[in-house]
């Protein structure tokens, strides 16, 4: 990612510091507070399409059992807050105020199904329940929810969410980089469109594909 891409210096008359302040901001991604920030961004994008590439499986579709496992080393209060935030985000999605597109690398679902990589040691019943929940939600909410699966051997994407035409957010672990400059948002939207065009599994076929992973 070049400095010119971040700042748009070649086409902007403002001072670099002013450009950064206007187009780029950082938000701490501590899990519970980040969930509240994400919900606020989703609400802000009401009426616009939201596009999302998650870092693992989509948080918005994680079951309580999956969150219990992920938060095993955290305080119980954090799990409670996180689960409530996920429910609020799912309620927002179910309201139909915005179309939602998600692009997921196929290997993430395969790893969950087989209990390998990130999901090593996670009980099969929890993994199966998680996959079935995603498949069911994807089927019930189609077409306002569309999930596309891509081959990470051919395509790559950092975790990113584009909230309509005015905001794009990249997740970098400890913080979120958020962009509000139109050209930066447009560029990331184009990146997501590329993932969709090159997807191996189309949205219509995702529910049956996921169910086929459960053995």
Q: Where is each model-derived feature located?
A:
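Residue-level signal for secondary-structure boundary elements
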Residues: 18, 31-32, 200-204
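Hydrophobic protein-protein interaction segments
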Residues: 42-214
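Basic, Lys/Arg-rich alpha-helical nucleic-acid-recognition elements, primarily the DNA-binding modules
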Residues: 1-24
């Amino acid at each position: 990612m070049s400095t010119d891409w971040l700042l748009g210096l070649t086409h902007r008359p403002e001072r670099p510091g002013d450009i950064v302040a206007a187009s780029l901001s950082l938000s701490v991604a501590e899990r519970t507070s980040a969930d509240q920030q994400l919900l606020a961004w989703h609400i802000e994008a009401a009426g616009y399409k939201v596009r999302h590439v998650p870092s693992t499986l989509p948080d918005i579709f994680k079951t309580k059992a999956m969150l219990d496992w992920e938060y095993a080393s955290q305080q119980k209060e954090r799990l409670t807050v996180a689960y409530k935030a996920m429910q609020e985000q799912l309620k927002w999605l179910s309201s139909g105020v915005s179309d939602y597109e998600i692009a997921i690398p196929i290997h993430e679902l395969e790893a969950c199904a087989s209990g390998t990589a990130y999901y090593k040691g996670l009980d099969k019943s929890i993994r199966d329940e998680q996959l079935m929940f995603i498949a069911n939600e994807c089927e019930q909410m189609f077409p306002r929810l569309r999930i596309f699966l891509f081959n990470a051997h051919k395509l790559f994407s950092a975790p990113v969410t584009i909230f309509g035409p005015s905001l794009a957010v990249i997740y970098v672990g400890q913080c979120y980089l958020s962009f509000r400059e139109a050209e930066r948002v447009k560029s990331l939207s184009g990146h997501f469109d590329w993932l969709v065009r090159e997807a191996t599994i189309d949205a219509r076929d995702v529910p049956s594909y996921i169910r086929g992973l459960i053995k």
